[in-house]
Amino acid sequence: MALLQISEPGLSAAPHQRRLAAGIDLGTTNSLVATVRSGQAETLADHEGRHLLPSVVHYQQQGHSVGYDARTNAALDTANTISSVKRLMGRSLADIQQRYPHLPYQFQASENGLPMIETAAGLLNPVRVSADILKALAARATEALAGELDGVVITVPAYFDDAQRQGTKDAARLAGLHVLRLLNEPTAAAIAYGLDSGQEGVIAVYDLGGGTFDISILRLSRGVFEVLATGGDSALGGDDFDHLLADYIREQAGIPDRSDNRVQRELLDAAIAAKIALSDADSVTVNVAGWQGEISREQFNELIAPLVKRTLLACRRALKDAGVEADEVLEVVMVGGSTRVPLVRERVGEFFGRPPLTSIDPDKVVAIGAAIQADILVGNKPDSEMLLLDVIPLSLGLETMGGLVEKVIPRNTTIPVARAQDFTTFKDGQTAMSIHVMQGERELVQDCRSLARFALRGIPALPAGGAHIRVTFQVDADGLLSVTAMEKSTGVEASIQVKPSYGLTDSEIASMIKDSMSYAEQDVKARMLAEQKVEAARVLESLHGALAADAALLSAAERQVIDDAAAHLSEVAQGDDVDAIEQAIKNVDKQTQDFAARRMDQSVRRALKGHSVDEV
């Protein structure tokens, strides 16, 4: 499915040279960076072979550290070790203090009420902290790819608002990165599994990370992912599994509840190791604080079953919000390291009635999807696989009376773009309007591509031409077209979304453009004829209404002359002679001028009846 691949002037001296791009999963607990090499998307590891980068930054007066080194300082220097900064992104200080009252950091408010974290390196905002994490990931990618990145795609939760998304973009710019796109995390996961090119329908993305749980219900339609509903629990994750198991081991080992921090750390490390082992083994031997014991998968499942049930309750709520049933879900994508737990996979499969997709490492799946998207956006895909574009390849418009296409956004317009145009009603008392969205370069509907239809209802019942409907076409950076129709006096509106690029190949686009040139003269003549026929129909419609209301203003002879002129116009309007139709319209206008003047006089007299000259 090809669209036009655009190379901007000056972007590259060698247009066929492969550009370097990366996908970044900027996570709450851990972050990853991935790229496409030799046609395969893969996450990039550090010098020690570790793919995950803990989303932790430790600040000192002389500098900072990111990742594993920073995480070791979390307990030693709490105030200067910032973790889970993603939770703070795009929030005011008041909001943060209300949501997270137990954070170990000291905050100050900036002039506009945004949070500033007090550290040994000075006052830092969440954008700066996120930028330091992004710099570390970018450095890993630059070293692995032996060159500077041309662009990145960064993933964000589907529920992130504009402020949180803008904060993420600002962090990337501060890190010196060119953001090709922000991509919703569930969409990235679906792309990693190739679901964007598969069958249409509903997809669930079950994301159980270390500290949070998110469920997203998506609808894939014509190559577009629409987020139907999101839900989850910001205080539920794999860390809770670890703490439950650590408490169980402590009880079994008879370790006092308030033992020292070293023993608590040892307990937690043992619990994490046991949890990981129980994903493959039926039982595991645990050694901690001089105690040795056996823990079975069954015992572990009993401990975590209530937490897994909580995630499924959130899934049920999200499905209800989306207005779909569990058995309507085509695929379930698993994201987050905690989805490796067998009980989680089992219960999710039972809930949705199908085995979830687990073939891609759930820690890496979001970053891999982002890398695939980045590779496309930076221009590395061959033409036959290009799905995203920087200009509109074919004009977008609406069907108007007479089967004509009114172009609203011409082809080769750069995106994102928004254009609006006003339309009006054709008939007296018209209270609804059918909006038919078209794509193509030809003048007639029959020669263009139909994209979508929707109706605007609730238009005030006014004379023809009295209502004014503003139709707005908006194409975002992903090539997603939104069309909104609004009646200006009442504000009533309707809208639809569609992806114009879906299902078109380069050859089809080229053919449509070539046809528009080959048939240009013929199309202009056809349009002129259609326009005259529409005008003839409008004139006759208006005349019939006037005669029905005020025929008494005419003598029999006058009425006959007008009827003859109207009959002649009706007859020639059935033919293909543009000039004859135009002359017949002019003749009707000439024969009805006196009638129109009398109707106007009558309307004025009615309006003035009962009023004095002074009142006027």
Swiss-Prot record:
GO biological process: cellular response to cold; chaperone cofactor-dependent protein refolding; iron-sulfur cluster assembly; protein refolding
UniProt-listed CDD domains: ASKHA_NBD_HSP70_HscA (cd10236)
Annotated GO CC locations: cytosol; iron-sulfur cluster transfer complex
Induction: By cold shock.
Tree of life domain: Bacteria
Any one Gene Ontology molecular-function term assigned to this protein's record: unfolded protein binding
Short name of any one Pfam family annotated for the protein: HSP70
Keywords (A to Z) from UniProt: ATP-binding, Chaperone, Nucleotide-binding, Stress response
Function: Chaperone involved in the maturation of iron-sulfur cluster-containing proteins. Has a low intrinsic ATPase activity which is markedly stimulated by HscB. Involved in the maturation of IscU.
Family assignment from sequence similarity: Belongs to the heat shock protein 70 family.
Name of the protein: Chaperone protein HscA
Organism whose genome encodes this protein: Escherichia coli (strain K12)
Gene symbol of the encoding locus: hscA
